[in-house]
């Protein structure tokens, strides 16, 4: 049985538009972001998701609610799907961070164990978000090719994708640049029995027995509406 998972990033916020570091600040969708949320809801509805989980931050929750209205589902929230906590950077513009901490943003993007002052690393985020998916696998034997949709944030989705694919830590930075109201699709397949031993333990291993028996594959990355909302 194949399980499909869609990871959807929230619509645009004013912080996105002005290149400010949001992290776990509870920002709202911009007018464009609201339009993106409704548009992506209409696009994903024909895939008939069976459940919708969302970060409890407003920008993700409102995006999830737009999809839920199209398919007649409730939105279940989980704070573990929040964006990376950016510590002292939260609320600052990119240029303000670069002025106060030269080269720090590059360190943050290229070193998954590195964290901003008083913030989280990408590995921290991968651990808490992976647990959400593994628990969903464990609790949902009915999960089939109709997708579960998780609505979250760019950094959180990048970290979760790398964790589900069991990448080495130095490979985590390959996932970045997920657009607003764009999504990732992965599929989980039974892991082959009797595979050769000696493989290294994943940086962020599965946390439930059922999840340990699955191998996730990347089907789509950074897929969005065509043409983008605002250009239609």
Residue ranges and their predicted role:
Residues 45-48, 136-147:
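Glycine-rich phosphate-binding loop signature in dinucleotide/nucleotide-binding domains
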Residues 11, 154:
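Active-site metal-binding loops of divalent metal-dependent hydrolases
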Residues 12-67, 113-132:
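Loop-to-helix element that buttresses phosphate recognition and phosphoryl-transfer chemistry
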Residues 6, 76-78, 219:
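General small-molecule cofactor/ligand-binding pocket signal
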Residues 1-3, 69, 84-96, 138, ...:
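Acidic, low-complexity terminal tails and accessory targeting/binding regions
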Residues 1-6, 51:
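Extreme N-terminal starter segment of soluble prokaryotic enzymes
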Residues 5, 143-152:
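Generic beta-sheet signal
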Residues 39-105:
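Phosphate-coordination/substrate-recognition cap region in phosphate-metabolizing enzymes
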């Amino acid at each position: 049985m194949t399980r499909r998972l869609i990871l959807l990033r929230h619509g645009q916020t004013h912080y996105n538009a002005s290149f400010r570091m949001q992290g776990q600040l509870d920002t709202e969708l911009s007018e464009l972001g609201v339009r993106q949320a409704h548009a992506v809801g209409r696009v994903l509805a024909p895939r008939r998701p069976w459940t919708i989980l969302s970060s409890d931050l407003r920008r993700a929750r409102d995006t999830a609610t737009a999809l839920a209205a199209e398919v007649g589902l409730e939105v279940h929230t989980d704070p573990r799907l929040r964006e990376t906590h950016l510590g002292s950077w939260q609320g600052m513009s990119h240029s303000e961070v670069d002025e106060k901490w030269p080269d720090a943003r590059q360190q943050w993007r290229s070193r998954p164990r590195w964290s901003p002052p008083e913030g989280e690393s990408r590995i921290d985020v991968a651990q808490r978000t992976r647990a959400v998916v593994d628990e969903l696998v464990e609790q949902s034997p009915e999960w089939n090719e109709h997708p579960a949709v998780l609505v979250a944030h760019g950094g959180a989705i990048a970290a979760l994708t790398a964790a589900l694919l069991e990448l080495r830590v130095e490979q985590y930075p390959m996932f970045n640049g997920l657009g607003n109201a764009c999504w990732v699709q992965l599929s989980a397949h039974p892991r082959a029995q009797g595979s050769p031993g000696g493989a290294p333990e994943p940086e962020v291993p599965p946390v439930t027995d059922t999840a340990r028996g699955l191998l996730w594959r990347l089907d789509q990355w950074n897929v969005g509406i065509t043409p983008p909302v605002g250009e239609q």
